[in-house]
Amino acid sequence: MAHKKGQGSTQNNRDSAGRRLGVKRFGSQFVRAGNIIVRQRGTKVHPGDNVGLGKDHTIYALIDGVVKFQQKDKNRKKVSVIPAS
């Protein structure tokens, strides 16, 4: 017979660190080529002019310029980089 009570184990006591997603450069901000503009899961924001789309749906600048967010249609946003002149 046990003289001490057995220790119960916990199962739901874990949490993962946040993934640091979101907008990294906002509208009217200057960016250099290669700067990350948005980190996202899926295409919440769609790529416009002078931006690239990474395999993890990261949107990044292809040229130096100014970030511009636009409403593509009712449900879609797009982000472009306007060349700095």
UniProtKB/Swiss-Prot annotation:
Name of the protein: Large ribosomal subunit protein bL27
Record lineage: Bacteria, Pseudomonadati, Campylobacterota, Epsilonproteobacteria, Campylobacterales
Gene Ontology terms: biological process: translation
Keyword Transferase attached: no
Transmembrane segments: none
Start and end residues of each stretch annotated as Disordered: 1-23
GO cellular-component term (any): cytosolic large ribosomal subunit
Highest taxon of source: Bacteria
Family, similarity comment: Belongs to the bacterial ribosomal protein bL27 family.
GO molecular function, one term: structural constituent of ribosome
Pfam families, per the entry: Ribosomal_L27 (PF01016)
Keywords, comma-separated and alphabetical: Ribonucleoprotein, Ribosomal protein
Xref: PROSITE patterns: RIBOSOMAL_L27
Keyword Metal-binding: no
